[in-house]
Swiss-Prot record:
Reactions catalysed, as given in the entry: 2 superoxide + 2 H(+) = H2O2 + O2
Root EC class: oxidoreductase
Record carries keyword Cell cycle: no
InterPro entries given in the database record: Fe/Mn_Superoxide_Dismutase, Mn/Fe_SOD, Mn/Fe_SOD_C, Mn/Fe_SOD_N, Mn/Fe_SOD_N_sf, SOD_C_sf
Chain positions recorded as Mn(2+) binding sites: 2, 49, 133, 137
One Pfam family it belongs to: Sod_Fe_N
Family designation: Belongs to the iron/manganese superoxide dismutase family.
Protein name (record): Superoxide dismutase [Mn]
The organism of origin for this protein: Mycolicibacterium phlei
EC number: 1.15.1.1
Key words, A-Z: Manganese, Metal-binding, Oxidoreductase
GO molecular function: metal ion binding; superoxide dismutase activity
Primary role: Destroys superoxide anion radicals which are normally produced within the cells and which are toxic to biological systems.
Length: 138
């Protein structure tokens, strides 16, 4: 179920934080880097899935409306052009990851890009708007 899957990431975050605090208290720098990586993975999984659950619709989606529709038409030429680019980002992933539509706050524009695995490797200044889970279990 969705809640069980998501709970695994939340538990992973909490476990990584506890282990990270212990490693810092003991001055174990090698363990600090390992636990920071684990924290990034589980926190990325939590954040990515939180956005994804909100993107899902029980009856499927349709074209966006309002400001988002206007921005897509303006920046991609049409919804069909956006969908083709977004689909290419999703299908072009090597291994596990996510396809993302994000808002670039610095450039004031929409971007499509890929996230690898669960790492929170979102470019600086980007707000993820739409994510598609491309992990093999999805």
């Amino acid at each position: 179920s969705h809640s069980k899957h998501h709970a695994t990431y939340v538990k992973g975050v909490n476990d990584a934080i506890a282990k990270l605090e212990e490693a810092r208290a003991n001055g174990d720098h090698g363990a600090i880097f390992l636990h920071e990586k684990n924290l990034a993975f589980h926190l990325g999984g939590h954040v990515n899935h939180t956005i994804w659950w909100k993107n899902l619709s029980p009856h499927g989606g349709d074209k966006p409306t309002g400001d988002l529709a206007a921005a897509i038409d303006d920046q991609f030429g049409s919804f069909d052009n956006f969908r083709a680019q977004f689909t290419a980002a999703a299908n072009g992933l090597q291994g596990s990851g996510w396809a993302v539509l994000g808002y670039d706050t610095l450039g004031d524009r929409l971007l499509t890009f890929q996230l690898y695995d669960q790492q929170a490797n979102v470019p600086l200044g980007i707000i993820p708007l739409l994510l598609v889970d491309m992990w093999e279990h999805a």
